[in-house]
């Protein structure tokens, strides 16, 4: 039987349970009195009179600053970040007036697609800049209410938490003997969340009718995909500011149920694993998840959901870019291929920049990637370093107008050995991993 206690490392991962110590809340939106009410509870367990906070010019201005920092493409109205910035004061005044008068209506969401490793594409919804600002204001007002309830098993898109925290929790569970893992995949989660059930979750906490109506309008905003336009019957678009918060809210019930049953779940948005001590427990955990998903009108992907003992070869699981198998962490193939695609884009043979300029362009990307994947097994890194150097040697050969011929690789290596690139400041993961592995 699973243990009924929440893992100690998960408890510690919650930065603080006193909202008055939260540094990420907007003081102009959430006063000390409101934060204290989170702890003490509000009458009827629901929050009223939030609309004025959403419409407040200060809230909208703070939201605009966040939208401007994140950049992003224009929505269906064609208004870019730069164009909005040129007339920001006027646009914000109009937005305040429209919200207060009840005139604001969400525009259609422009759908685009971003490539995924393997040739698949992920749909992305791009709201207008104005809608991003209003959604950001809603998020600033609602997030503390939801965050107060969210459990330590959830790590994605939450203040002060992230993928590295989730991975540390997985490592701790594996070291504690939880080797049987349920690797679950929700099929099209962001596009399939039932609107009515999601709004029920919101209404269980919020009673401000205008806030609820605005949220509902955003969920039902038309989607424009090329020449096609339709009204969605479910889902919350990936790319919308408010979507991650709502997606976490809908899966909060799963966190609660699995924890109450004593299962060790680690969730990052819609990606989650359940770590168990034996196969029997894992099978029971999977049945529990399947039942919960059926009740909540969600679907587990049959081909991507499985159970295995991750100590065995071929029975590992993938989570947040890593593959856990045979007692080690490996870089997921898709993550490795995605990095190589980025390296190729920066090292095209017809690139006319100097070697110093190319290395200066490569290094921040390589350092950032290593910073995340440095806990992978050491054999992952030499092949990546070698791939980078081969790309650079091909550029140098072209700069010298040398033709490629049989045996060229060995000649290139002799002409430009590894030490040559080290002298030019190229970041190498093998060296960085060796340094990071030294005892301190």
Please place each PLM-identified region on the residue numbering.
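Non-catalytic terminal/accessory segments
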Residues: 1-440
């Amino acid at each position: 039987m699973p243990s009924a206690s929440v893992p100690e490392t998960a408890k510690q991962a919650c930065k603080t349970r006193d909202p008055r110590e939260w540094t990420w809340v907007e003081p102009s939106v959430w006063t000390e009195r409101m934060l204290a009410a989170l702890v003490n509870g509000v009458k009827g367990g629901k929050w009223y009179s939030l609309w004025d906070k959403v419409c407040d010019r200060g809230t909208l201005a703070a939201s605009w600053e966040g939208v401007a920092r994140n950049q992003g493409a224009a929505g269906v109205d064609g208004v870019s970040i730069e164009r909005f910035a040129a007339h920001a004061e006027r646009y914000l005044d109009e937005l305040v007036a429209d919200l207060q008068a009840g005139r604001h209506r969400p525009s259609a969401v422009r759908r685009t697609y971003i490539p995924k490793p393997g040739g698949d594409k992920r749909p992305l919804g791009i709201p207008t800049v104005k809608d991003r600002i209003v959604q950001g204001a809603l998020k600033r007002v609602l997030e503390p209410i939801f965050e107060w309830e969210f459990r330590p098993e959830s790590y994605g898109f939450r203040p002060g938490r992230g993928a590295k925290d989730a991975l540390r929790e997985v490592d701790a569970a594996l070291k504690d003997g939880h080797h049987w893992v349920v690797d679950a995949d929700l099929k099209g989660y962001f596009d399939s969340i039932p609107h009515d059930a999601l709004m029920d979750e919101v209404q269980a906490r919020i009673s401000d009718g205008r806030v609820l109506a605005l949220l509902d309008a955003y969920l039902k905003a038309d989607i424009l995909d090329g020449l096609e336009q339709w009204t969605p019957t479910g889902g919350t678009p990936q790319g919308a500011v408010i979507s991650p918060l709502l997606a976490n809210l809908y899966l909060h019930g799963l966190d609660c149920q699995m924890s109450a049953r004593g299962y060790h779940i680690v969730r990052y948005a819609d990606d989650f694993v359940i770590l168990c001590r034996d196969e029997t427990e894992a099978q029971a955990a999977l049945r529990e998840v399947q039942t919960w998903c059926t009740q909540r009108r969600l679907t587990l992907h049959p081909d991507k959901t499985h159970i295995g003992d991750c100590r065995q070869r071929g029975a590992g699981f993938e989570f947040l870019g890593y593959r856990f198998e045979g007692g080690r962490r490996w870089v997921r193939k898709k993550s490795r291929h995605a990095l190589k695609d980025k390296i190729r884009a920066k090292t095209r043979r017809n690139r006319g920049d100097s070697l110093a300029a190319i290395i200066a362009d490569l290094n921040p990307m390589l350092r950032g990637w290593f910073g995340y994947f440095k806990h992978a097994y050491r054999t992952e890194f030499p092949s990546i370093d070698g791939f980078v150097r081969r790309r650079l040697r091909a550029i140098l050969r072209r700069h010298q107008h040398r033709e490629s011929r049989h045996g060229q690789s060995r000649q290139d290596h002799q002409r430009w050995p590894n030490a040559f690139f080290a002298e030019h400041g190229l970041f190498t993961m093998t060296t960085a991993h060796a340094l990071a592995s030294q005892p301190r």
